[in-house]
Amino acid sequence: MKPVLVWFKRDLRVDDHEALTYALLEGPVLPVYVVEPGYWANDYTSGRQWQFVRESIAALDAELTGLGQPLWTAVGDMVEVLERLHSRFGFQVMHSHQETGPDWTFQRDRAVKAWCASRDIQWIEHKQHGVIRGLSDRARWSRQWGAVMDAPRLARPAALPLVARPPKPAVDVVAHVSIADERLVGSQPGGSIEAEALLNSFLETRGERYRGGMSSPNTAETVCSRLSPHFALGTISVRTAWQESQAQRARFQSEKSAEAKRWSASLKSFGSRLHWHCHFIQKLETEPRIEFEEVHRGFIGFRPIEETRLDRLERFEQGLLGWPFVDACLRCLAQTGWLNFRMRAMLVAVASYHLWINWRETAHVLGRWFTDFEAGIHFSQIQMQSGVTGINANRVYAPIKQSMDQDPDGRFIKRWVPELEAVPVAWVHTPWRMPVSMQHQCGCLIGRDYPEPVGDPVQMAREARERLTNWISTHDLSGEAQRVLKQHGSRLRQARPRYGKKANSPQLSLDV
């Protein structure tokens, strides 16, 4: 009997796995993962992300091997690998999930589809989460999302019949793949076991103060679920997190204690973030061009890439802007691969408004840094925080205010900017204002030990607002804003276009 091929992509798990479940109904399964060098050559990829993928592949192989059929892992062009596998096994059906990724994966999928047609192979794609293909507007999207999330989860297979053992174990194949970069080495551990442990600890202890603690980087590191890279690689399903968190919330809703109220509020907030997760990926699924072009076409040409100051971009990448809290956030993200959503939004806003860097440049830098890079969320959010979507509030963050609000005692700053460790709290947010005598006293001379600020943040913000106001006043933006709202706007809120009518689009948080 010919095997059914299951192509693992960004769904590296065996629990609640639609493609694997339905493939098994047709016959013995040949599970396949292909490391594609072409993908890893893109600007938004990094060795940090590969480390997470590599660990997740090893974990998946261990689970599949335990069920009876090891993972076949190869390195190369997807079509060429499929051709070799077809020559050996003669499979006529292939299952995978529907992937919403960057243009590279979209073009690869088109090539795979053409190859399948040429070999008369049936390729069946399954939903990965709440993203809907072929959607023209958002009129019924939330209802459809809810139906997917509330559907019964699919159990892991009891066993997999052995089709054939691979020439090399998956761990040996991936061990010889090197994705080099200079500084991006820190990452969360990958694999389904890690994902399940994070979800359990979040629902049992860490998540109680999630709602109140997600904004500050001092607390977000602990109170957030930290599941975002696992959602990005599919080591756990969004549906699992949704159902487990809502079941836990239901247990607390009948209780009156302060603890129960905190838990109920936090888990409600967490559920909202799971909804927004799919909401933003849906934008890229519906309109793939937003990887390269402004969501609102009326902003094409606004903040042109030619105006990007390379010296500012370099200081941004190095975490040497001279604004301590911003530098601390940049260094934390660059070294660990994670930062809470509010601070990510601040970094993008600072790059876009204060430094006047084109959003594409920022997208490439931060894309490499994020362990949890998810193209749909990434490009949508970068544009949203850069003010080029046309339906969201334009927020120009005040770096010093954020510093004082989110890190009042300078603990986060001193952790990530050790040059300022001896600087008194009174000066740590604005060390350039510190008297020279005090600089000598604490051993931190501005301009020598820590850089002069890249500019006056208040003045730079003022200039950015003036540019934005001038663009809006000299361009007809309302018609395109209506189109964007119809195609991409959430129906859970009474959002309005930013131009032509009064806007009402609150800032969203995607921390999970």
Describe every region a protein language model picked out.
Residues M1-G271, I281, T389-V512:
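Active-site "lid/cap" and pocket-lining segments within catalytic core domains
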Residues R226-A426:
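Active-site-proximal binding-pocket segments
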